[in-house]
A protein has these predicted regions:
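Acidic, surface-exposed loops and disordered segments
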Residues: 1-226
């Protein structure tokens, strides 16, 4: 969990080459990602040539900071294979999911090995195909920049757990989720206080109502009014 929560998107890199063993381990992490029916339709292109990295940065909508990363990994999918097993859904959806799962594994592995990485999804697809020699039956999905980080970005703001967590059906919020996982939440504490107050108020009302009914009943028996 620490690796997940401390990972950051790195866009500044030191001018230090990466040990190829670490690059290989990062790619191995991508290959460990799940795929539908274990079809393993992902493909990985490791780019370290300076000129080609400059071309990739240009194709990624002129994100020139990418050139400083000594390694780019282009994650592609073999859409012919995806379609062969799962038809149009495999070609249009599963293939994208597989590349995304591989990319996330690789980002975490990079962080584990002390490397910085960033997920790039904005690029000219045809330009990327040309630069990396991607055949027509394959499609580039994600580019990951990789290198030793030259920055430590702060943790970006995130919504609290119960904001987007539902139980059983969409929109049914899990208001006690943080209590279940022992994670304090001001929102949950507020709900607990409100619930206790409502119970106390309800109890007091019931007691008062019971006393009134008792007085009324006693009055009927004795003919006295309280």
């Amino acid at each position: 969990m620490e690796c997940i929560h401390t990972r950051r998107s790195i866009r500044k890199y030191q001018d230090i080459p990466i040990e190829f063993e670490k690059v290989g381990r990062v790619v191995e992490a991508g290959m460990a990602a799940p795929t539908a029916g274990n079809i393993q339709d992902y493909r990985f292109i490791i780019v370290q040539d300076k000129g080609k990295r400059a071309q990739i940065a240009e194709a990624c909508l002129q994100q020139y900071w990418m050139e400083a990363a000594p390694t780019h990994i282009v994650i592609c999918v073999d859409i012919k294979r995806s379609k062969q097993f799962y038809g149009i859904r495999g070609e249009r959806l599963y293939s994208v999911q597989h590349a995304a799962a591989a990319a996330m594994n690789m980002l975490l592995a990079a962080h584990h090995f002390g490397l910085g990485a960033c997920w790039i999804g904005a690029f000219d697809e045809e330009a990327m195909k040309s630069i990396c020699g991607v055949p027509e039956y394959a499609r580039p999905e994600v580019i990951i920049t990789l290198g030793y980080p030259d920055e430590i970005p702060p943790r970006p703001p995130k919504y609290i757990l119960e904001t987007f967590s539902y139980i059983e059906r969409y929109g049914n919020r899990i208001r006690t989720f943080p209590l279940v996982i022992a994670e304090p939440s001001p929102v949950i504490e507020k709900h607990v206080r409100e619930t206790i107050a409502a119970v106390d108020e309800g109890t007091n009302k019931l007691l008062a109502k019971g006393v009134e009914k008792g007085k009324s009943f006693w009055g009927k028996l004795t003919g006295k009014k309280e």
